[in-house]
């Protein structure tokens, strides 16, 4: 009896344990992407120094989530498509007579409401991978590469605020520091709403594995991706390495 059970289990594992297609959801942190602190400094336009200062905070990493769909039925290669959203928060402050005026920004084109400024990076990947088989184990490792389309937001920095100040400078002449800060805060928020997403194209390399037991229509997967190319705001130090850890439904 024990021999029959062992034989049946081995036969089951030896059968095709991988889906012809699947869709999943995953956690996706990006390693090494950082923003350095923008130190408090006076705002200056055309050699005119205003009695208002600006500063912004920093972050050490970004994290997020994503979705993936894949096809395993093709001969020799698999194909997968991924969409990731990663983000981090930082503060931005106008200073008037030593008093902080915190800025809350609604970044157009992103699924986030008005809040402290956020850096948001989105990417869509299409990948072609070469799978490998491990006999008697329901694991499908693979390596591959593909095309990436990037979208990301700008950083609310000194240059952006000075640009807004330059466009509204005449209306603020003769005002007190507090009046300038109050008016400038509103103008910055309005300008940020109209600021679109940066878009660029690049490539990526990936290595990963999918795990799926026979018959059960559930799969788990893990990927590591190295991104090549892509354009970011000059204040962003992009890490170019992301992980995907998740699972989903597979047929």
Regions picked out by a protein language model, each given a short descriptive name:
Residues 10-12, 16, 110-111, 115, ...:
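Short stretches within intrinsically disordered, low-complexity N-terminal or propeptide regions
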């Amino acid at each position: 009896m024990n021999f029959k059970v062992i034989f049946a289990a081995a036969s089951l594992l030896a059968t095709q344990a991988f889906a012809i297609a699947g869709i999943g959801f995953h956690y996706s942190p990006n390693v090494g992407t950082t923003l350095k602190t923008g130190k408090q400094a006076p705002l200056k336009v055309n050699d005119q120094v205003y009695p208002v200062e600006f500063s912004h905070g920093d972050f050490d990493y970004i994290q997020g989530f994503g979705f993936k769909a894949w096809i395993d039925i093709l001969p020799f290669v698999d194909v997968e498509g991924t969409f990731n959203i990663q983000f981090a928060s930082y503060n931005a402050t106008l200073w008037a007579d030593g008093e902080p005026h915190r800025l809350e920004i609604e970044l157009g084109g992103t699924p986030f409401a008005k809040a402290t400024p956020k850096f948001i990076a989105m990417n869509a990947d299409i990948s072609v991978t070469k799978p490998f088989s491990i006999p008697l184990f329901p694991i499908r490792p693979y390596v591959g590469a593909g095309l990436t389309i990037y979208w990301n937001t700008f950083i609310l920095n000194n240059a952006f605020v000075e640009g807004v100040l330059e466009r509204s400078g005449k209306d603020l002449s003769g005002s007190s520091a507090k009046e300038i800060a109050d008016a400038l805060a509103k103008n910055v928020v309005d300008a940020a709403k109209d600021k679109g997403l940066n878009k660029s194209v690049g490539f990526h390399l990936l290595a990963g594995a999918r795990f799926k037991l026979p018959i059960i229509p559930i799969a788990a997967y893990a990927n590591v991706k190295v991104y090549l190319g892509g354009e970011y705001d000059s204040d962003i130090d992009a890490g170019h390495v992301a992980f995907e850890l998740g699972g989903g439904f597979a047929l």
